[in-house]
């Protein structure tokens, strides 16, 4: 069942070579990748924090307020499942310039964006209230290193997951899928993942291009199969790495695995929620990273394509809840 979810999330409709990254990533895991990631996230109980890193500045030479629809949408859907299913506290970390649209996605997913103190009150009360916390992050290296340590101490996260988050290369730069340097204005959130690893906090990476945090686990494959791979490959590895056709899809596969493992079909993502989230992302100013247009598409694919992937994942997962004869 989990193998099917992995295959769906890894469909390379965009023909970017990401399907060839799955095998080396899978070789690092004892089970399908969506299940491995879900098990790490399921260690979070009521009131526990999960740090979720996202936000991809796609045209920083124009403005650092222009981010992609891929990433925040998937994180919002997965954060909803962590909140609704486990009463955990998603702590979404992004560029300070993207806090507003990322928060809009979380609200569209049904979560109130609050402070950590307020989130603790919410998760300790018998009356359920779905909440999430958002934080910006420094641009400068030394400040980022200090903030990373402070955040791990403050939140004591059960896991850290980075979704569609461009990762620093060994040269300290960031590059897009064309190999272009787009380091300008980008928060150094890599140090947060690095600090989590040092403190033995479980880490997960989700990406679709080889340049995301986590892809450092399969450097040779990125160099071989991804155009400009030797230029753009991120240096950081994560405990579990999910290459996906679109990073959002990786989140939905993890969400489906969570639903199956927890025995809670109500946690599955839906096409209706997908429409709501992508439209909310565009309305908040996020753009399609491929086209640069502020409209309801992701990675050059229509809303209907993404809704179809969500339906496929749900159909596969639903079989786990049906009695066998």
Identify the function of each model-found stretch.
Residues 29-32, 36, 70-73, 77, ...:
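Conserved active-site and cofactor/substrate-binding residues in soluble primary-metabolism enzymes
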Residues 104-191:
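An acidic, phosphate/nucleotide-engaging active-site surface
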Residues 55-58, 165-168, 209:
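Short glycine-rich anion-binding loops that position phosphate/pyrophosphate groups of nucleotides
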Residues 210-325:
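C-terminal functional extensions of proteins
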Residues 89-97:
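Short internal beta-strands
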Residues 87-88, 197-203:
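A short helix->loop->beta-strand "cap" motif at the edges of active sites that frequently abuts
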Residues 1-49, 56-58:
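Positively charged, low-complexity intrinsically disordered leader regions
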Residues 65-87:
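Histidine-anchored nucleotide/phosphate-binding helix
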